């Protein structure tokens, strides 16, 4: 049964070591796994030879005299004892080898730029007309080198989303949320709350129109499952655990959707399976103590629409591009200008073989901010969750590939709208594509969100 990491340690260990070096991961554990696998295969050959000997001895027994039969029966028993001991040794070595391999990150795809951190990420395309404050033009151009962006210079610098939300529009309150829930929580009111609902409806409309099945997943997962979906040792400070329970709050709908076929086989003709999930996302953000302290860009709880695909291994790279294309369609509809970035090897999460980020230009901050993360996890999650495909026509089995992408993370999309669609009087233009989802509600805003007195 194919599994990319196991195939590499057997057939091309140098390639695996190179992948680990690209991620700045010490290859020592992988080298141990290579040695364990060599030992495992050598013992397996011994076992197969012993089984053959046992079969030969057993086949001779019926034709022997009673005295000779007794000797052969004893010989067969001794062989079985040796086989049993060797099989136990095999299982122990196999478990040790696989446990090591489970700690390793996915194999980096050849098209991923090599570098230790996000400064090596490579912008590969831009879309839209960028609004750039006159004093930020050089900074903007430095972030889109070689991509020939279309941009207009504006004379006023938009207010940052945090101040726009709370001081100008007066439709958010992070101070009171901080008092009652802690930092990085928020209240959203009226027009901005309606805007969030429209974003969700719009994203679901776009993705389900492409044949993706809508799912509302569990908001918690058991420890065994979450450890299979993510590298829990690395991310244990990023996700919330329920005290006294073997349950974790999900950080994205990706995780429970990935677990939809936990320890199951999927008929090959059913693949690909496309899903779009709607859920809250809960994140500790422990590693971001001093980042984005104001506003709603980086918060502990937000709503998110997530795309997910289970595919055959040979098809996963085309579906990676499909997921990115879907996300681009959503942000093009919102008319939010963005760049797509190919994430560097040192900035990839353990699950992903390759990842794109879609980053929207934020004119008040004079920088691009991540809105979408789009990953091909190949068989990294599927092996850990034991999700296999069965192709009866071609008489083959293997592990499926899993892919995921944000469709929209509502709070981040709201921050992008507040900065990009802001007028000099503080009003915010509602994207035209969202207006049909607001028209049906009497109290919802229709064309603009305008500053108001705090109630």
Swiss-Prot record:
Its EC number is 6.1.1.11. Gene3D superfamilies: Bira Bifunctional Protein, Domain 2, Serine-tRNA synthetase, tRNA binding domain. Signal peptide: none annotated. Keywords: Aminoacyl-tRNA synthetase, ATP-binding, Cytoplasm, Ligase, Nucleotide-binding, Protein biosynthesis. One of its GO terms (cellular component) is cytoplasm. NCBIfam families: serS. This is Serine--tRNA ligase. The gene is serS.
């Amino acid at each position: 049964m194919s599994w990319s990491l196991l195939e590499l340690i057997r057939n091309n260990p140098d390639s695996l070591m190179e992948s680990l070096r690209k991620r700045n991961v010490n290859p020592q554990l992988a080298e141990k796994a290579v040695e364990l696998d060599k030992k495992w295969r050598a013992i397996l050959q011994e076992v197969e030879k012993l089984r053959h000997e046992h079969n030969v001895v057993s086949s001779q027994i019926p034709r022997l005299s009673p005295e000779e039969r007794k000797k052969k029966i004893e010989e067969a028993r001794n062989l079985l004892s040796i086989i049993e001991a060797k099989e136990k040794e095999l299982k122990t070595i196999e478990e040790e080898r696989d446990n090591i391999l489970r700690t390793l990150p996915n194999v980096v795809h050849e098209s991923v730029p090599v570098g230790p951190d996000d400064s090596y990420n490579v912008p590969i395309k831009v879309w839209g007309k960028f609004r750039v404050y006159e004093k930020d033009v050089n900074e903007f151009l430095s972030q889109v080198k070689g991509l020939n962006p279309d941009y207009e210079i504006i004379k006023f610098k938009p207010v940052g989303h945090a101040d726009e939300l709370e001081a100008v529009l007066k439709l958010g309150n992070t101070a009171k949320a901080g008092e009652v829930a802690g930092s990085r929580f928020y209240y959203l009111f009226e027009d901005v709350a309606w805007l969030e609902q429209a974003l969700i409806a719009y994203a679901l409309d776009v993705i389900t129109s492409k044949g993706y099945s809508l799912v509302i997943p569990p908001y918690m997962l058991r420890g065994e499952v979450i450890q299979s979906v993510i590298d829990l040792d690395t991310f244990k400070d990023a996700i919330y655990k329920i005290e006294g329970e073997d349950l974790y709050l999900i950080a994205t709908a990706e995780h429970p959707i990935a677990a939809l076929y936990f320890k199951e086989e999927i008929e090959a003709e059913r693949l690909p399976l496309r899903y779009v999930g709607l859920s809250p996302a809960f994140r500790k953000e422990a590693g971001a103590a001093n980042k984005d302290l104001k506003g709603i860009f980086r918060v502990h709880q937000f709503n998110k629409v997530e795309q997910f695909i289970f595919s055959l291994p040979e098809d996963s790279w085309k579906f990676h591009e499909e997921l990115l294309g879907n996300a681009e369609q959503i942000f093009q509809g919102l008319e939010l200008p963005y760049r797509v970035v190919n994430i560097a090897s040192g900035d990839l999460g353990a699950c992903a073989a390759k990842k794109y980020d879609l980053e929207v230009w934020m004119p008040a901050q004079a920088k691009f901010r991540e809105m979408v993360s789009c990953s091909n996890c190949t068989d990294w999650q599927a092996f850990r969750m034991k999700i296999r495909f069965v192709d009866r026509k071609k008489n083959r089995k293997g592990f499926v590939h899993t892919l995921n992408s944000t469709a929209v993370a509502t709070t981040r999309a709201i921050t992008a709208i507040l900065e990009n669609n802001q007028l000099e009087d503080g009003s915010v233009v509602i994207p035209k594509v969202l207006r049909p989802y607001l028209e049906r509600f009497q109290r919802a805003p229709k064309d603009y969100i305008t500053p108001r007195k705090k109630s």
